[in-house]
Amino acid sequence: MKKVSYLIYLWLVCCLGLQAQSRREMGGIYYAYPVTDDAGTDSPAVKAPAGFSPYYISHYGRHGSRWMSRDERYLWIEKQFADDGNLTPLGLQIKSIVKRICENAKGNGGKLTRLGEQQHQAIARRMYAHYPQIFAAGHQVKARSSVSDRCAKSMLAFTSQLRNLQPQLHLDVKTDSADMAWIAYESPELKALKKRTKVKAQVSPRRFLQQLFKNTAKIDEPLKLMTEMYGLTSSLQDNQ
């Protein structure tokens, strides 16, 4: 019996420990990958096969943590809580929180956050720590980004960190619309797949709305509001 109790206790401890992490990971594209303060040597480097030495790295990365994609998304959410008379007590509390979030986000829609910069700086530190011979003095680094502001700034955070680590690198850094054809390429097959598999989410926002609004019929796009609120709250971890 003691053994069973111990196993149950251990299981509960593990579950509670994972709960906070899993909630963050549920943010999907807004999940903020952790950044460590070390030089990157905490994770083991991939070893080259016997008789070979690393001489080249090709890195294709997404932009770092960002704000929600457009200011209009913040404004739209805030507008849904404009009618105080239709808000429940919880709805009034949420309105106050949403207002503070939107004020803080004003003018930042789609932009890279400070955490996003740190994530790409950390990638550069790990690369340099694991493969210093590739980034020796006089070696060349060629970097390209899409025309998106957050992507260009992610690239600059990465290359600037490399420059700090090895000032004698030859950096070729550019953002050019001419490169978009291969940076953001979508094959005809992928486009067809997206069209074929696009389905409307079968999720009811009824319970969600009833917690916030007295008359839910006044909300024109209930599913959109629920998903946008999910995106709003998930994105908060990107601005810590």
State each model region's role.
Residues 21-139, 148-240:
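Signature for phosphate-centric chemistry
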Residues 143-145:
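N-terminal helix-rich structural modules
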